[in-house]
Amino acid sequence: VEESQGSVQNVMEVAVRQGNYVFTTPPVLIKLAQNGGGAFKGKENPRFNEIRALFPIPSLTMHFVLRADSGVTKMSDLAGKTLLLGKGSFGAREGAKYLKLFGLEGKVKLANVELNNAVPALKNRQIDGFVTAGSYPAPNVIEAAAGTGITVLSMTSDQVKKSKRTRLVIPAGTYPGVNQDIVTTSLPVVAYTISQMSDETAYELTKNFWKQNSAMANSAAWWKGVTPKMLENVYGKIHDGALRYYDEIGVSV
């Protein structure tokens, strides 16, 4: 899921959908929709106030991945290095934004390589590192860690604040050889519905999601990062049916 035209369209559909419409989108788009901002300027609709949250799904998490022998341990060390951002993706746009915010624009050589070639490019020293955004643990970061040995950069509190994104900590040991917590940023993503969904349906959907979450984590590791604590990222109201389930399991929202 990306903060893309598709995510905007998911929210716009609320104006015409009825009943059991369920969609995923970053919470920031719900805020914009309900306040007539950004892509929703001039497209205000009272139905946007009927949007209700159900549960979080894996966030898009920023990774600045460097070869372990690159000598890079903090963002400022990127000056003079060759970095792969990719093209057109959320991670590429976000990575370019961060370089500018952190005073590195023009100081980092950007490699003209596609992101799907990042791991071999890192291994053959064509690049010093790459930037990727995905739910952690990200498969390409695991592959890089296993094949080359990596460092994943942490951001300072000031850098996180400048990004205007949500702070996220990737636990130590998530990636082979990376034995300390990684402080980074994320774009939360949440499953939403509308108030017309019955309380019982919302309750069952939410209950089944959390019951299945551990099974999903066994087949796709990034589901392990989804915890009830991520409900803190929700913007707007949570559906009454979902609230009933959270109350049952003792989760404060």
Q: Where does each model-flagged region fall?
A:
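Sec/Tat-exported extracytoplasmic proteins
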Residues: 18, 23-26, 33-36, 68, ...
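A generic structural signal for alpha->beta connector loops
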Residues: 48-51, 80, 107, 149
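Short, glycine-/small- and polar/acidic-enriched structural segments
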Residues: 1-77, 84-87
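Pocket-lining segment of extracytoplasmic ligand-binding domains
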Residues: 26, 35-37, 44, 70, ...
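An extracytoplasmic/periplasmic, membrane-proximal ligand-sensing/linker region
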Residues: 113-117, 123-124, 134-147, 152, ...
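Bilobed "Venus flytrap"/periplasmic-binding protein-like clamshell domains
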Residues: 1, 56-124, 228-232, 236-241, ...
